[in-house]
């Protein structure tokens, strides 16, 4: 006795195959949606982390930072911020792992923006200067040997970046910041 396969495959027409292809999202479209979702998630998480870490930092009027850089330059951040251009204040440390990613961006911004950095718990001026020379960084550095600047500012995370314009804090970022993110913060200050 012969058994026949009672389930015959239906003949597919060209119209059917076109319909099935249009119903299936393309891989590019699928990956695009995934990428947008990931960017949104990372953006929201980054914003939440900035908010969480900056809670102890001042809001509104900037806390004065007045001192002499390790390069011998007198610096008054509030006065610098009153010329209509924002000042990028960069709190960092020579031992900070995340600062390795942010410091090159800060150094490149030093050519076109006002930058003042504050080195936290990084040792004597000579050690900080050797670090700057080894990395070929040329942004101004105030060495916070006593820790009073970081205490006044409530800094508990390095790196931390504060944008100040006209004596007011316009933006605070903690952790790794992209060049585009920093540029946008200064642009909208």
Outline where the language-model segments fall.
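Alpha-helix C-terminal capping segments
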Residues: 80-84, 103-113, 134-135, 181-189
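Thiol/disulfide oxidoreductase modules built on the thioredoxin-like
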Residues: 133-137, 145-189
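Structural microenvironment flanking redox-active thiols in thiol-disulfide oxidoreductases
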Residues: 100-135, 145-151
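Short pre-active-site segment immediately N-terminal to redox-active cysteine/selenocysteine motifs
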Residues: 84-87, 91-95, 157
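Hydrophobic beta-strand anchors of alpha/beta hydrolase catalytic cores
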Residues: 88-89, 115, 161
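A short beta-strand-turn-helix
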Residues: 66-87
């Amino acid at each position: 006795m012969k058994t026949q396969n009672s389930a015959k495959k239906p003949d597919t027409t060209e119209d059917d195959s076109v319909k099935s292809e249009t119903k299936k999202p393309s891989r590019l479209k699928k990956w695009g949606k995934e990428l947008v979702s990931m960017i949104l998630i990372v953006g929201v998480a980054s914003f939440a982390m900035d908010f969480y870490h900056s809670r102890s930092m001042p809001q509104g009027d900037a806390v004065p930072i007045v001192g002499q850089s390790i390069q011998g330059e007198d610096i008054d951040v509030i006065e610098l911020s009153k010329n209509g251009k924002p000042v990028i204040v960069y709190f960092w440390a020579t031992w900070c792992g995340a600062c390795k990613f942010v410091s090159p961006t800060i150094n490149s911004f030093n050519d076109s923006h006002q930058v003042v950095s504050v080195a936290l718990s990084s040792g004597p001026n000579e050690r900080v200067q050797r670090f700057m020379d080894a990395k070929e960084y040329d942004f101004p550095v105030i060495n916070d040997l006593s820790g009073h600047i970081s205490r006044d500012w409530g800094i508990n995370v390095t790196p931390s970046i504060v944008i100040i314009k006209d004596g007011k804090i316009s933006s605070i970022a903690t952790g790794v910041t992209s060049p585009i993110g920093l540029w946008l913060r200064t642009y909208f200050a």
